[in-house]
A protein has these predicted regions:
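Alpha-helical membrane segments of multi-pass proteins
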Residues: 1-230
Length: 230
């Protein structure tokens, strides 16, 4: 439920109305679509109970579809850690390129497609991190740490560009109606700071928690002597 509520906040609350006027509000929207709603939805994904709750006759109808090898291959491809990492970061960086970003102001359909790209690729990204039951990890658990840290590096680069460029990168915000006391450049600096701090928290906190868990005595007991020495 929390995931659906956060998704509603991103696309149907006043934040959605402000994104044409304030880049800072727009980046909050992107943050919710990529870093709040997806992990919450993955954590609450009732996959098995939902399937078991389907009427028996309907399960019989769906069984050939869910057992299709091509479907399993497609799901495995998109939920593979490397694929999920690349898709999420390509969407994140690609849509923030000025030429692509400006297209979202010219077409509502493109704007919604951008949001769909952010959300769906982020669901795959966080699925790898959280691995909700009955999912099985493709990579060892420790690999989640560089998986998250490398994503944070790219986030830091993009955030720093917005915060320290010294000029307004997205022309549409130069001409947007001013609904706050912030100048367009100040608005962009605030947006970059938001992205930097909020996304870094979301990436770094689970990486640190996982690191501490793996370094705990209980976890170390399960390692071979050679790994402990390293």
């Amino acid at each position: 439920m929390a995931g659906l509520v956060s998704l509603w906040i991103a696309i149907a609350s006043p934040i959605n109305a402000l994104d044409d006027y304030l880049l800072a509000a727009h980046m909050i929207q992107h943050f919710i679509l990529m870093s709040i709603a997806p992990p919450l939805i993955v954590l609450g994904a009732p996959t098995v109970p939902l399937l078991r709750g389907i009427p028996r006759w309907f399960r019989v109808v769906l069984r050939p579809f869910f057992r299709a090898r091509w479907l399993h291959r497609v799901v495995r491809f998109f939920l593979h850690p490397l694929t999920a990492w690349l898709l999420m970061n390509i969407a994140y960086l690609g849509w923030h390129v000025p030429a692509a970003f400006e297209l979202t102001f010219r077409s509502e359909a493109i704007h919604q497609f951008e949001h769909a790209c952010f959300f769906l690729t982020s669901v795959a990204f966080w699925w790898v991190v959280l691995a909700p039951w009955p999912a099985r990890r493709v990579w060892p658990r420790w690999a989640v740490i560089p998986y998250l840290l490398s994503a944070d590096v790219l986030n830091t680069v993009l955030s720093a560009i917005l915060a320290f460029s010294g000029r307004v990168i997205y022309p549409s915000y130069l001409h947007a109606e001013r609904i706050s006391t912030l100048t367009p450049l100040q608005d962009q600096i605030a947006a970059g700071a938001e992205m930097w701090v909020l996304n870094s928290i979301v990436f770094l906190v689970p990486a640190v928690v996982l690191t501490l868990k793996m370094l705990s005595p209980r976890s170390l007991q399960g390692l071979s002597p050679s790994l402990k020495a390293n």
